[in-house]
Amino acid sequence: IASAVIGTSLPCFFPQVRFARVAAAVGVLLMGAFWNSFGSVMHGWHSWIFAAIVFAMLPSGHVRATQSLAWREHYLRAFTVAQAWVMLGYTLSGIFKIAAGVQQMANGQAGSFHPEALSRHTAYRVLEGVPEGSVNIAPWIVEHPYIVWPMYLAFLFIESTAVIVAFRPALHRLWGLLLILIHICIYFSLSVMFSWQIMLVGVLFLCSPIAPNRAVSLREIALKFPLVGDALAWLASRKSSPREQTANGGIPASAR
């Protein structure tokens, strides 16, 4: 444990040195192995280990505007890989929930898309003996299934499309905030705390170096919003195509 703590603390003093970041990756791996060696799996360590390994691949040197274009591209690519990996975990979780819901619907069962899905799952967890904290909204969720149902559908959408957001910097801070709020709600309803994941999402997305260094407008959010923005872009391209053909004598741009 001591060696892991020392290794993970080195980048705090020497973030520009790759050796320090390699030592941190090894330290995180050792800590993850230690905490997962007691008979249960702590999934929160998985993303941290991979992110630490990716950060070890960041180029050496301080982040400055005077760095070469190749250096800055290398830095941004490595950071984007770490972001995409974390979001891929959320997307896989959402897709599995949707796939299970479709299968349950086909079998005539109350699945992920049923209005009482979240309430039933919460009630099941409470019957399992979930420890109650000082604030617990589980009884309210069970008693108001139709109020929380739209929230659960929004949760499925946020999870399933997370990996798309990794490549849309304008949405980094918004999606990071939404994911953190989801984890907080899970804690207050099911007493399952994702503190490690909250910290990682905060570092990678709320503090994303790729996100615009300004306030993002609602129009920009709508144009970048997963599926919605893609549909708007497709409709815009469909509307502009006839105009382009008319301007070019009816000859599409691709045929010229």
Description of each model-found segment:
Residues 28-36, 75, 113-116, 185-189:
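Short edge-strand/loop segments of extracellular domains
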Residues 1-28, 53, 81-98, 145-189, ...:
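Functionalized membrane-embedded alpha-helices
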